[in-house]
Curated annotation (Swiss-Prot):
Gene3D superfamilies: Fe-S cluster assembly (FSCA) (3.30.300.130). It comes from the Bacteria. Signal peptide: none annotated. This is Putative 1,2-phenylacetyl-CoA epoxidase, subunit D.
């Protein structure tokens, strides 16, 4: 996420707050800023440029989210606005805020374990319901491409795990 310098125009702070209200359509308890999808907010002349990185390049919600950003900006008088799709570097779960990880757990989805640079290591996947680490992978593919399906061996409940990407 862009660090806000003390010399940033006051509207930049307002825009970050505005964008932090746009929910992710697949996980509505998280916003696009919680996930780290908004990379930067820049004033360019009389308008605004928003850097946006989807969670993966084929994400079906990309156009919807770009439209939501444009609508929020326009509705609140921040025009003209240009949303720049930034695919490099690719989005990573490392960009998620700590608060987002906790809200995932409260929502019933086990948050990503570890960091993306260690994604090849088998993670200790904790059950979001009972906090047990005695879990079993059922399927690499869960309800969305970024999730895997697990079952807790302690409470026997199935749950989604947000893959470390």
């Amino acid at each position: 996420m862009q660090r806000l310098a003390t010399i940033a125009p006051p509207q930049v702070h307002e825009i970050w707050a505005l964008l932090s209200q746009i929910p992710d359509p697949e996980i509505p308890v998280l916003t696009i800023t919680d996930l780290g999808m908004v990379r930067n907010v820049t004033q360019m002349g009389e308008g605004w440029v928003i850097g946006f990185t989807p969670t993966y390049s084929g994400c079906p919600a990309t156009e919807h989210l770009i439209g939501a950003i444009r609508e929020a900006m326009t509705t609140n008088g921040f025009t003209p606005v240009q949303v720049v799709l930034q695919l490099d570097p690719a989005w990573t779960t490392d960009w998620m805020t700590p608060d987002a990880r906790e809200r995932l757990r409260e929502y019933g989805i086990s948050p990503p374990a570890g960091h993306s640079c260690h994604a090849h290591l088998p993670p200790e996947v904790r059950c979001p319901r009972c906090a047990s680490v005695h879990t079993t992978l059922i399927s690499e593919f869960g309800s969305t491409a970024c999730k895997a399906l697990y079952r807790c061996d302690s409470c026997r409940e199935p749950f989604d795990y947000f893959k470390c990407i």
